[in-house]
Every structure is written in C-alpha cells, then in structure tokens.
Curated annotation (Swiss-Prot):
NDH-1 shuttles electrons from NADH, via FMN and iron-sulfur (Fe-S) centers, to quinones in the respiratory chain. The immediate electron acceptor for the enzyme in this species is believed to be ubiquinone. Couples the redox reaction to proton translocation (for every two electrons transferred, four hydrogen ions are translocated across the cytoplasmic membrane), and thus conserves the redox energy in a proton gradient. This subunit may bind ubiquinone. It holds the Pfam family NADHdh. This is NADH-quinone oxidoreductase subunit H. The keyword Cell membrane applies. GO terms for cellular component: plasma membrane. It is found in: Cell membrane. The lineage of its organism: Bacteria, Bacillati, Bacillota, Clostridia, Thermoanaerobacterales.
Amino acid sequence: MGENLFVGMAKGLRTWLESQHFVPLVTDVFLMLLAVVGVLAFLFLNALFLIYYDRKFGAWVQARLGPNRVGPRGIFQTVADTVKLFAKEIFIPNNVDRWPYLLAPVLIFTIPVMLFLVIPFGKGMVPYDLNLGVLYLVAITSVETIVLWMAGWSSNNKYSLLGAMRSVAQMLSYEMPVILAMLSVVMMAGSMKLSDIVAAQQKVWFIFLQPVGFLIYFIAVNAEFKRTPFDLVEGESEIISGPYTEYSGMNFALFFLAEYTNFMIGAIMVTTLFLGGWNAPFGWTFIPSWLWFIIKMYFVITLYMWTRWTFLRIRIDQMLNFAWKFLLPVSLANIFITGFGLYLYRMIRW
C-alpha cells in the first residue's frame, strides 16, 4: 500500500482526467504542474526542518541547547525566522547594478528547484525521467557560478565581489572532480538516466564498487555547495556574507533557502549515485521505496552536518591546492582503473 500510494494516486488522476475527455496534452501539462507543486512542497518542508536540524545538531556537538524558546524544544524557530525575513524591508542600495542585483536571488533559488525535477524519489516516482539526467544535473549546477558572480559584481561592494571571486574559483576547481566521479558511476551503470543508475544498484550499491569515487564525490560536492570546511565564499570572519552582503529581507531569504536546498540536492545525489537510491538494503522491501530514499538522504545529510560542525575552515590556497593537486589526479586515476576493470570483467565474461 505505502509503496504504490503516490504512483497509484497519479495513475488514478490520469485515468479520471482521460475519462473526462481532456486533451492528452492538457492532461500531461496538468500532471507535470502537479509534480512541480509536489516537489516545491517537499523542498520547502525539508528546508524548514533542515535549518532546525542543523542548529540542533550543532548545539549537540558543541554541548549547548540550541533553539529552545519558540515552541516545544524550539521547533517553530525556523518558522519565526521565515516570518521575520518576510516582514523585513527589501532595501536596495543606490549604487547597485539594479537588474542583475534583483535577478540573482530568483535565479539562485530556481536552479536547485530545476534539479529536483529529474530526481527518482522512489519506484516510478520521477517527475521527469530524462535519458541524459546526469548531464542535465552537471549543466544546471554549473549555472550557479554565473549567478553568484552576478550577485557579487552587481552589489558594488568589495566584500561581495571578493566572495563572488572565491565562489567562481571554488566551483570551477571542484567541478571537474564532481564530473569525473559521476562519470565513473555512469561507466558502471552504462547509462546517464538516473532511474537506470538506481536500477543498476539493485544487487550491489556503487559505494562498494566505487569507494574512491564516493569519497571524491562526497568531498567535492561539499565544496561545490560551500559547506564547512569549504565555506570561504561567505566566511563571516573575513568577508561578512560574501555575495549576499548587500541583500536583505526576502532577497536574502532566497539565498539562504537555496543554500539548504543545494545541501539537500548534494545528499540526494550521493544517495542516488552511490547508496542505491530507493533500493532497500537486506531485502527489506516491506518499507516503501520513497521512505528508504528519505532515510538514506538524511543519513548523508547527518554526515555532512558532522563535517560542518567538527572541521575548521581552510584557507583559499589550501582549498584550491587540494582540488587541483590531489582530487583531480585521483579522479582521473579512478576513471582509468574503472575502465580497465570493466574491460577485464567483459573479457572474463566472454
């Protein structure tokens, strides 16, 4: 029942619309819009919970209480902060480049929402199952570099510009290890379709076949999405808030929401590419596939939070050296070893 709940609801709705003699195009568009609304609801609710969970986890690591005033155990603190940001005035400084300045917050939030449209959340639960899903993810995430540069440059602030320059250097440096780690998974699965990659892990998860690729991807994605120890783009002790320094009110809230949405996307991609996606471990199929997906996602999120609250921020030169002098060569070596291993495997099978 739980396994087919959402899929059954979608099929039932499609059957009902067709019985009402709706044009097939109208039916498809309506169901796609419904899927987008569902993705947005999932995104907002998880982002609200993630902010609270991150604060509570950090408090536990540092032996303090964390949010504890608004609601039982502070569970409504994130809601209160959201209302506060909604109520704040959106102040636009005089010397900003107005249109790029206003467009950047909208685009920075749109990018992760677009990524959610190709994620296989469960068996048969993919809003849009692209044949080139991996390529789509790489292409869309690359746009974030341009958006952060827009925000920093248009703000006409030295701290914002410095943060934007750091973001470009950081994201370009760690883009190659991310792509190469994803390529090793594509080689194993023989497909760029995310649902095919999940299906290829039905017997063995790729974390066991690609342990080096997993570590590379885990580290590089953390750097791509600017989480500690790679949070140099908005290092509070150095450049205030980086590209977000001149933003206030709802504009700042969009940047903040995009940060946690990207955080969620990183955990989702680790789950999809290396932890079997919605596949159940130990044959425990009595738990719905979408619930397994969420459990794995939050396990990876907890690992990322652990690194955030236990590691120190590194310097920009250390971060770039680590990407170009260590991660990239190891990523290339992993690709060659994967290719050679697949060649030997096929030779033995012959």
